[in-house]
Amino acid sequence: MAYAAFRSIGAYVPSKILSNEDLSKMVDTTDEWITKRTGIKERHIAADGEFTSDMGAKAAQIAIERSGIEKNKIDMIVCATISPDYFCMPSTATIISTKLGLENVTAFDISAACTGFVYILSIAKAFIESGMKKNVLIIGAEKLSSITDYTDRGTCILFGDGAGAAIISATDDKSEAIIDIHTGADGEFADLLMSPNGGSGSIHDTLDQEAKSCFMQMKGNETFKVAVKTLTKDVIEILQDNNIESSEIKHFVPHQANLRIIKAVGDALKLNDEQVVLTVEKFGNTSGASIPMAINDIYESGKLKAGELMLLDAFGGGLTWGSALVPFSPLK
């Protein structure tokens, strides 16, 4: 039987920084107000003319180079994004495939908001274990600045741009394998986080209303309560299902939405500060890109070593959620 191994990680962060001080000149807010409520100090913003596919391709190129796997051996690309280059078609994954010079690969996008990376990790695992694919490139890429209302202080303080990518490949060695992935969704809470843009559910009569509805909308307090409850329940279940103690987790890599949410879940699991990966302060919430960007951060800082166990955990619009137990298994 083939198993799926997490081989490499890469990320791309735009150079432009939007600080809390910058935002205080745009909306009624302060650095203190933002930091106290979110833990965010700054976020990165894509340059004019820089698209989601550009960022995704740059992150992917790094992941490919680090993997030790020949580029032409990649047989599938899956991109998680809620800010694609084009909302209808083509998919961002197909555009990325061309930018990477890859031909005849399966390529498609999925939309699971901030849980996107866990979802595409589960897709890669399933395709590899079925024997249908051998080397899958998964990408979380977001240009959230393109769907952020910079007159709404409740959302514009949260979001940033960036991309992260990983190579998942087949292995015969079970010790290298992704251990387990949980995913779920509940549409009952769909209105907590949404971007009611021009889909078939649109009810707007004018183009101005339609354009405004493309921006992300969030019910912050309700989302916080549901997120903490759902994330805590999910990570406890995946640990119990696999007879793994929280002390065995080397790196807890949650979706970087809000420092208070992350700390609440970490406290529920009795994790120490060294186990919890935090990048929300410098990147903000980058939705489907946040987990791979956080993994890349600990990789580049030398904290992530071969064989170490990561617990990934995410929650997003839909509502969606997911968790994964993932050993870091670079090719020897």
UniProtKB/Swiss-Prot annotation:
GO molecular function: 3-oxoacyl-[acyl-carrier-protein] synthase activity; beta-ketoacyl-acyl-carrier-protein synthase III activity
Metabolic or biological pathway, per its Swiss-Prot or TrEMBL entry: Lipid metabolism; fatty acid biosynthesis
Annotated SUPFAM superfamilies: Thiolase-like (SSF53901)
CDD domains registered for this protein in UniProt: KAS_III
Compartments reported by the entry: Cytoplasm
Gene Ontology cellular-component annotations: cytoplasm
UniProt function note: Catalyzes the condensation reaction of fatty acid synthesis by the addition to an acyl acceptor of two carbons from malonyl-ACP. Catalyzes the first condensation reaction which initiates fatty acid synthesis and may therefore play a role in governing the total rate of fatty acid production. Possesses both acetoacetyl-ACP synthase and acetyl transacylase activities. Its substrate specificity determines the biosynthesis of branched-chain and/or straight-chain of fatty acids.
Domain free text: The last Arg residue of the ACP-binding site is essential for the weak association between ACP/AcpP and FabH.
Stated family: Belongs to the thiolase-like superfamily. FabH family.
Record-given protein name: Beta-ketoacyl-[acyl-carrier-protein] synthase III
Native source species: Sulfurimonas denitrificans (strain ATCC 33889 / DSM 1251)
Gene name of this polypeptide: fabH
